[in-house]
């Protein structure tokens, strides 16, 4: 639809939110195995999402489901991180899995391949396999553990747990 100049103008007049259509060119260059990993909602995200929250208006206007809106929110919220070299490390992917989920990390990785020139498709496949096989990290310290070591239940315990978790994540 976006290859023909006339149809592109018509579509953009009707749906001005689909302003990132050039990202679809990158998907067309992928092999079939990688292309098949993109579902309709992720392709729609590629057309709509940037670092702004314009996706919210799109979701409201077209009455998308909460799951689509949450998926868009996750991608938009991490948009700036997608542009860094550090994003494509296994360590960062593992952190994303801990903070959100394997599906969210997978969506971000697939989305990033179309908005960033910093990764090769071979590395994408490797990282997608890593996401699939990676065990979800579990924070090793609990409130019970801290209570055994002298902390009393309450606000102080919660602050200490949060502080330890932030250091563990970093």
Label the model's feature ranges.
Residues 2, 107-170:
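Charged substrate- and nucleic-acid-binding regions of tRNA-handling and nucleotidyl-transfer enzymes
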């Amino acid at each position: 639809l976006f290859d023909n100049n006339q149809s592109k103008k018509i579509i953009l007049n009707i749906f001005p939110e689909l302003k990132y259509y050039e990202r679809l060119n990158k998907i067309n260059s992928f092999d079939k195995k990688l292309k098949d990993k993109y579902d309709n909602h992720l392709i729609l995200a590629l057309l709509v999402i940037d670092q702004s929250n314009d996706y919210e208006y799109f979701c409201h206007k077209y009455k998308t489901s909460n799951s689509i809106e949450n998926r868009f929110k996750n991608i938009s919220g991490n948009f700036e991180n997608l542009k860094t070299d550090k994003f494509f490390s296994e360590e960062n992917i593992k952190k994303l899995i801990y903070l959100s989920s394997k599906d969210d990390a997978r969506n971000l990785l697939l989305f990033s391949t179309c908005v960033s020139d910093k990764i090769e498709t071979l590395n994408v496949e490797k990282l997608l396999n890593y996401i699939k096989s990676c065990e979800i990290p579990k924070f090793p310290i609990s409130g019970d553990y801290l209570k055994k070591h002298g902390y009393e239940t309450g606000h102080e315990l919660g602050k200490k747990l949060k502080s330890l978790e932030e250091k563990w994540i970093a």
